[in-house]
A protein has these predicted regions:
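N-terminal Sec-pathway targeting helices
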Residues: 1-10
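Active-/binding-site microenvironments in catalytic and ligand-binding cores
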Residues: 5, 17-231
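Hydrophobic membrane-insertion alpha-helices, especially the h-region
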Residues: 9-17
């Protein structure tokens, strides 16, 4: 019931934000202009993709440290947030990670990352652009951000989540996994269409699938539908 209520609420919020400022003679340069569906499904262009058909998944803190939030326990206010996009340059090395220097350079160009943001990490190697269907079949990799950079974002910018285009494996860096869980951060893996997003100014809405009540407190991963409202 909680997840269903949240989905109804986010659709309502979506409608308000998109249409509230569209009044005759009203200048609203900062309003949201369109929505980008970042969900990865079997048919990327499908307009009626259900959450349960989504290949995009949320990894809750409980998947990283047992006893922390499961997917159905993440507070709703942490599922709607400002969205920033940081490019990961893979031209030099396949195992590139976002570094503290990358974060500093991003903020020099775009301004300080808003508190409470979700950080999307976009692959920027021209030779490996991922389509919506490709990202689900890509190799599983570490979260593409250095441990100290992630810790800075969580502690100094109070980020609440990270979104990536590939599957994520935390087995090689349990320290980072622990940091994420202790800060209440979740990860959205196998997302799509990051190339359609600006670096800043968007709003992300994450809607987990409805989980059976008996498993509500145990499921630490779940399919999600994610939308970005773009200015």
């Amino acid at each position: 019931m909680r997840i269903r209520s949240f989905i109804i609420a986010y659709v309502f919020i979506l409608a308000i934000l998109l249409f509230a400022d569209r009044r005759p003679g009203h200048a609203a340069p900062d309003r949201y202009s369109h929505v980008v569906d970042l969900t990865n499904g079997q048919i990327p262009s499908a307009q009626h993709l259900s959450v349960t058909e989504s290949q995009t998944r949320i990894i809750a803190p409980g998947a990283l440290i047992p006893g922390t939030w499961a997917a159905g326990q993440i507070p709703p206010e942490r599922l709607i947030a400002p969205l920033v996009v940081v490019d990961l340059n893979l031209a030099a090395a396949e195992n590139s990670q976002i570094s503290l220097d990358d974060i500093a350079a991003w903020e020099t160009q775009h301004g300080m990352i808003p508190q409470g943001s979700v950080v999307a990490i976009r692959r920027s190697n021209p030779s490996s652009n991922l389509s919506a269907s490709d990202s689900a079949t890509q190799y599983t990799s570490d979260l593409p951000i250095a441990r100290d950079a992630a810790q800075f974002l969580m502690e100094a910018r109070y980020t609440i989540a990270f979104a990536v285009e590939t599957p994520v494996d935390f087995s090689s860096d349990r320290t980072l996994a622990r940091q994420l869980a202790l800060h209440g951060n979740y990860v959205v893996e196998k997302s799509a269409r990051f190339t359609a997003l600006p670096a800043t100014g968007s709003l992300i809405i994450v809607a987990p699938a409805k989980i059976a009540p008996a498993k509500d407190k145990k499921a630490v991963e779940a399919p999600v539908r994610i939308l970005a409202m773009v200015r």
